[in-house]
Structures are given as structure tokens and as C-alpha cells.
Amino acid sequence: MAQVRVGQDESIESALRRFKRTVAKAGILAEAKRHRHFETPIEKRRRKAIARRRRYPRR
């Protein structure tokens, strides 16, 4: 769960911006989108292989 503490002199807009950034870094929305529909084991393997290729490109 992403949490952001708002400082006394901090505006709501900047706190909201920080919250959105922490949610994006945690990957919460991406995970929710993945769980919208059932993903077969083959699709899961394919998605992980593509992510692995992106992370470690061939030289």
C-alpha cells in the first residue's frame, strides 16, 4: 500500500503528485490492469520473457 504523509506547509497538489509517483514506482496500477482478466500460463510466460528481453538486451 502506497502512503504519503502530507507536511504542514505542503500543498495538496504536491502531495497528490508524490502519491501518484509512489504508486507508479510500486507498479500498483500495472498489477491491477494485469488482474482484470485471467492470464493463462502461456501468456504469463510470454509476458515475462518479453520483460526479460527488455531488461537484458542482447549485445
UniProtKB/Swiss-Prot annotation:
Q: Which domain of life is it from?
A: Bacteria
Which key words tag this protein in UniProt? Answer: Ribonucleoprotein, Ribosomal protein
What are the recorded Gene Ontology BP terms? Answer: translation
Q: Return the InterPro entries for the record.
A: Ribosomal_bS21, Ribosomal_bS21_CS, Ribosomal_bS21_sf
Q: Which GO terms describe its cellular component?
A: ribonucleoprotein complex; ribosome
Query: What are the recorded GO MF terms, alphabetically?
Result: structural constituent of ribosome
Q: Spell out the NCBIfam families in the cross-references.
A: S21p
User: What is the official name of this protein in its record?
Assistant: Small ribosomal subunit protein bS21A
